[in-house]
């Protein structure tokens, strides 16, 4: 087994120095990965990025812009998957340059690791359903980019050690682990907040994916449901549990979003929620 160097990992978790252009790292706040589920077009994606950058600068929250350039895991064959890989990646590159903010996006197969990295993506995200795919983890690791591994809905937090080791063995200690809920029956997820300290034992930053944790998957309609009215509750509990970072998908009008609208945070609610979460963080 690969032995994770927790001294290196803990130092990185504390400073997050391996994420280029990450601001406000000395604020003592949690860091935030947030944005739309998928790049829908340049105008709306820029609007979301600009809005969150203004909020996080005001609140001094370290911020990474999040958007998938392509959605490979959709329920139905005719579900929206993207506007085109290169077009979407170009938009992410423009956002990084325009707002001087790091960006994170998902990859789904080996060639996509180098493709996304070539557009300057700072964090390569491994989707939960792919978190055990050794070749994919190794391909992401070999780019030298930070790798955010989402915990599969079917995995224990302890088992995520082995996913992290697959990246570390490639000489890349830039790892993050994300809790995104555990399957509860066929069509529901629950969050076991014990996962946060259990995964922090490995020494890497642990993120709570707030919005995906509220999904209601496997609906007979072929459209994933969600309970966005619980976003605030799950986010508050996550901060109270000591999570290092939060992941939230957001949109100006979730009802018109092209993917995952049922569990998104409405963009105009973002600042108020983050303000409340900072207050919780300050009393820990």
Placement of each model-derived feature along the sequence:
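N-terminal amphipathic alpha-helix/helix-capping segment at the start of soluble metabolic enzymes
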Residues: 14-32, 284
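Hydrophobic faces of well-ordered beta-strands that scaffold small-molecule active sites
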Residues: 32-34, 63-67, 103-105, 124-126, ...
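Glycine-rich, proline-tolerant flexible connector loops at the mouths of alpha/beta enzymes
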Residues: 36-45, 63-85, 250-261
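Active-site glycine- and acidic-residue-rich loops that bind
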Residues: 37-50, 150-161, 180-198, 216-235
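Alpha-helix-loop-beta-strand connector modules within alpha/beta enzyme cores
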Residues: 52, 80-103, 140-146, 197-206, ...
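N-terminal active-site wall of soluble small-molecule enzyme domains
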Residues: 67-125, 132-136
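Conserved anion-binding
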Residues: 75, 129-198
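Glycine-enriched alpha-helix->loop->beta-strand junction motifs that scaffold or abut catalytic
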Residues: 115-125, 139-147, 168-174, 202-205, ...
């Amino acid at each position: 087994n690969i032995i994770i160097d927790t001294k290196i990992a803990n130092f990185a978790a504390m400073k997050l120095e391996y994420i280029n252009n990450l601001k406000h790292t000395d604020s003592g706040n949690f860091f935030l990965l947030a944005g739309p589920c998928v790049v829908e077009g340049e105008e709306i994606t820029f609007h979301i990025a600009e809005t969150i950058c203004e909020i996080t600068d005001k609140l001094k929250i370290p911020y990474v812009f999040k958007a998938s350039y392509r959605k490979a895991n959709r329920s139905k064959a005719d579900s929206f998957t993207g506007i085109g890989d290169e077009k979407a990646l170009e938009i992410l590159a423009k956002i990084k340059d325009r707002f001087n903010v790091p960006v994170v996006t998902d990859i789904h197969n080996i060639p996509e690791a180098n493709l996304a990295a070539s557009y300057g993506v700072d964090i390569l995200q491994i989707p939960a359903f792919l978190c055990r795919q050794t070749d994919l983890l190794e391909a992401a690791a070999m780019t030298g980019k930070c790798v955010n591994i989402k915990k599969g809905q079917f995995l224990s937090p302890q088992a995520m050690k082995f996913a992290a080791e697959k990246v570390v063995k490639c000489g890349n200690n830039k790892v993050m682990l994300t809790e995104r809920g555990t399957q509860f029956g066929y069509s529901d997820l629950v969050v076991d907040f014990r996962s946060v300290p259990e995964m922090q034992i490995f020494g890497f930053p642990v993120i709570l994916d707030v919005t995906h944790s509220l999904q209601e998957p496997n609906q007979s309609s072929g459209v994933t449901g969600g309970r966005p009215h619980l976003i605030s509750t799950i986010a508050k509990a996550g901060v109270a549990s000591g999570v290092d970072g939060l992941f939230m998908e957001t949109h100006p009008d979730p009802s018109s979003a092209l993917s995952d609208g049922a569990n998104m945070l409405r963009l105009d609610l973002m600042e108020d929620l983050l303000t409340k979460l900072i207050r919780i963080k300050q009393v820990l």
